[in-house]
């Protein structure tokens, strides 16, 4: 798995909405998951240290994946278990690509682009994990922190010849229902599509 220099990744980073038919490998997905929510150590209080900064090490996010095309992995909905660095298969979803069109509101500037990616990352947040410490300020911190996560997805994708595109406009109710989130205590806050770049 070749990796570009950090300088090149930052300079070449663009939102990518056109993907090739090539699939991501499991090794590449593993790398992207590590880059966005991977654990790099523990502090003296037993809190996880990760590849992204997070206010007070509260880590309010969970990573769900809608996998369309990935080498050696069946299509479906998965959850990333960061402590174990493992994927948990949740369930298959009938008409997954059509559901992704509906979730992403069939973005008019590039129709159906998300369904053509290899994988759609969906980050959920459980605000209370930060609210107990920061009260109402937690909401601002959560929004900043999810930006760190998605930027790492962009840079890590770039480093392996893939491209990412963040998606901030989506059908909130539908995606929360699909992932069996209550939409109150836990809800999706950001999406990111990733696929191999088209030449």
Residue ranges of predicted features:
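N-terminal amphipathic, basic helical "cap/leader" segment at the start of enzyme domains
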Residues: 1-116
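Conserved hydrophobic/aromatic beta-strand scaffold that supports enzyme active sites
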Residues: 77-79, 120-122, 191-193
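A mid-sequence, solvent-exposed acidic-amphipathic segment
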Residues: 94-146
């Amino acid at each position: 798995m070749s990796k570009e220099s950090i300088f090149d990744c930052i300079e070449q980073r663009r939102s990518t909405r056109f993907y090739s038919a090539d699939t991501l490998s499991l090794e590449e997905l593993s790398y992207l998951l590590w880059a966005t929510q991977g654990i790099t150590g523990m502090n003296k209080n037993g809190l996880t240290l990760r590849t992204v900064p997070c206010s007070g090490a509260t880590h309010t996010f969970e990573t769900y994946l809608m996998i369309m095309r990935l080498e050696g992995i069946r299509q479906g909905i998965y959850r990333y278990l960061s402590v174990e660095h493992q994927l948990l298969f949740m369930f298959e979803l009938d008409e997954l690509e059509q559901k992704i069109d509906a979730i992403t509101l069939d973005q008019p500037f590039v129709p159906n682009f998300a369904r053509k990616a290899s994988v759609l990352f969906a980050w959920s947040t459980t605000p209370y994990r930060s609210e107990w410490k920061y009260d109402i300020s937690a909401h601002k911190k959560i929004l900043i922190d999810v930006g760190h996560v998605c930027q790492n997805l962009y840079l890590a994708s770039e480093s392996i010849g893939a491209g990412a595109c963040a998606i901030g406009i989506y059908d909130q109710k539908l995606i929360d229902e699909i992932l069996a989130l209550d939409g109150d205590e836990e809800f999706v806050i950001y999406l990111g599509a990733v696929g191999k770049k088209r030449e």
